[in-house]
């Protein structure tokens, strides 16, 4: 059976692995997922990510990040725009998750950006996910 929302699958794998205190999590590779992982790394939510060759296709391995006492750096992660209901926002109406404590990942014509980068550039786009 084909997967209808591979981005939601990625976010769920990250959420579950973080809750279970796993060191790494593997998932099928795509450029879009690698771009999301790049944003999460840049914002300090994960340690690192690598693309590995598998028997069939490529695998994206994400190394999760925890605090000194084992607290999760990803407290929550939520898919916003879904295949059945796409969510878009203009640059002046971009959401600020948890009053600015989290990030919104936005798919724009300039690639994937956070809401702060979109505000700086004055562009809007599709709201992919919230991370806090």
Swiss-Prot record:
InterPro entries: Ribosomal_uS8, Ribosomal_uS8_sf. One of its GO terms (cellular component) is ribonucleoprotein complex. It comes from the Bacteria. Pfam families: Ribosomal_S8. Gene3D superfamilies: 3.30.1370.30, 3.30.1490.10. GO terms for molecular function: rRNA binding; structural constituent of ribosome. Keywords: Ribonucleoprotein, Ribosomal protein, RNA-binding, rRNA-binding. One of its GO terms (biological process) is translation. PANTHER family: 40S RIBOSOMAL PROTEIN S15A. HAMAP family: Ribosomal_uS8_B. Belongs to the universal ribosomal protein uS8 family. Part of the 30S ribosomal subunit. Contacts proteins S5 and S12. One of the primary rRNA binding proteins, it binds directly to 16S rRNA central domain where it helps coordinate assembly of the platform of the 30S subunit. This is Small ribosomal subunit protein uS8. It comes from Bifidobacterium adolescentis (strain ATCC 15703 / DSM 20083 / NCTC 11814 / E194a).
């Amino acid at each position: 059976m084909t997967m209808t929302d591979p981005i939601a699958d990625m976010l769920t794998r990250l959420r579950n692995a973080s809750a279970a205190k796993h060191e790494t999590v593997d998932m099928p590779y795509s450029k879009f997922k690698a771009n999301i992982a790049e944003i999460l790394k840049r914002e300090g939510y994960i340690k690192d990510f690598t693309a590995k060759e598998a028997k069939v296709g490529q695998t994206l391995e994400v190394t999760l990040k925890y605090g000194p006492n084992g607290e999760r750096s990803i407290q929550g992660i939520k898919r916003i725009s879904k295949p059945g209901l796409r969510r878009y926002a203009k640059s002046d109406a971009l959401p600020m998750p948890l009053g600015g404590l989290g990030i919104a990942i936005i798919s724009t014509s300039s690639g994937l950006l956070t809401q702060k980068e979109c505000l700086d550039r004055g562009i809007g786009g599709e709201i992919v996910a919230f991370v806090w």
